[in-house]
Amino acid sequence: MKNKSIFYIFICLLFILLSINFNIAAEEISLNGAVKLLNKSSSQLDNVLRDIESAEIDLKLAEKGLAAEVTLQTSYTRLDEAPQSPTEYVLSPTGKINFQGSEVNKYRFIPVTFKKLSQDNYRASLSINKPLYLGGQVKNAVKLSEKAVQLSKLNYEKTLNERINSIIQAYFNVLIKDSLLSVQKNSLKLVQEHLDNVIKNYEAGMAIKSDVNEVEIELNKSKQSLYQSENELKIAKKRLADLLNLPDLDFSLIEPKLPELKEELNFHLQRAYNNSFELQSLLLKQKMNDINKEMENKLFKPSFFLNGNYTVQGDKLDLDQGDFNITLSGSVTLYDGNKSKLNLKKINLEEASLKNNQKQLRSNIETEIMAALYKIDENKKKLKIAEKNKIHALENYNQAVKSFNNGVANSLDVLRAETNLNQIKISQSQTYYQYMMSVYNLLYQTGTLNNYFEEVIKSENK
């Protein structure tokens, strides 16, 4: 009895473990979930975030451009022999000289007794250097650093938009390959059923051997297509798993919702202009050029510094017996070898290039938005046609099977109808997902993918 109880417990535990494994294998990932995983696992996004942090540190450094600098220097010297200082002198005549019309004697002091001084010598110096005014260069350096922070944050948004688009492409590629596999499985099932019917007719003398061979050939072709579809699905899942840093391929995808869409060109153009990372980047660079111009124009303005120094020196380190001095200094650049003018010329050339790039970029954006809208319209029309074709192909297939069963049609008619139905199902499935992809591509081209997944990204960053 005890052994039976242990056996039942073992069976229950095994069932639980298998259930857990099944649940893990059957894990479903939504498009929102994929974006969450991307935000968590993307090393490229991590690198861009580090760039933002680095730019913010540069901004803090620029803000400290007028900060005081305090320097402390100390030294100690031990002499090999103690120095001597004279304490008594004698006067010794050295001759006569004419002084103011009279002849007078000259003398010199000759030391005769000495005292030893300390062999120790201490020295300490405290210096404070404070820039008071640097010709407005610090203020402009802060402005440049602020623009650099904005540029790095803009680069993060651009990178995030591109990475989300990569995820969407890989995500829908898996859905397409999965749907193709389902079509191939269903096709194989239909061919197998037809083969069974042909074999029965052959055994009953109602079909010839070549009919059986034709269907078996078609069955083998269906198996080959099935193996190819299975392999393509594995590759597509592996690419998505690599993007999301998933450990294995034991997952399935949930079909995402279709974003709401306005098919107005001007509406999407305005969104693209407002959200274009490249356009915003060019505008920031133009502002940075303006700041650089201002810095070059202020190069010949004076700079002022305040310097304070307190020094103590002696055989004892007595901080109360030091010397203090304070200095106010100024400097101005009178001539820089014409470098400033050359730099201004270079900045003006860069500004002209930025304006040309901006004009070309706006033209490119318009082309991409028009192409995206045309693709949506094309896929929508193709999808309607594909759905009608599927209905007709299914009717033809059912009619061919019915005619074959009634002895009116031959086996090849059924195979042709089945092949046509299979191709139309594949086309309809691909067109359906391509239509969804084209809608998401419009979000990508308008730079609004980040906004569409904003809540998902925010929830992950909390």
Language model segments and positions:
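Periplasmic alpha-helical coiled-coil/stalk elements that build and connect Gram-negative outer-membrane
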Residues: 1-8, 29-33, 57, 158-271, ...
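Acidic, low-complexity, intrinsically disordered peripheral segments
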Residues: 32, 78-84, 89, 427-462
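Amphipathic alpha-helical coiled-coil segments
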Residues: 47-62, 159, 163-182, 193, ...
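Amphipathic alpha-helical coiled-coil scaffold segments and their short linker/junction regions
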Residues: 35-41, 91-111, 246-306, 451-462
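Bacterial N-terminal signal peptides
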Residues: 10-20
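Sec/Tat signal peptide C-region and signal peptidase I cleavage site
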Residues: 20-26
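Small/polar (Gly/Ser/Thr/Ala-rich) solvent-exposed segments
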Residues: 46, 69-84, 113-119, 129-158, ...
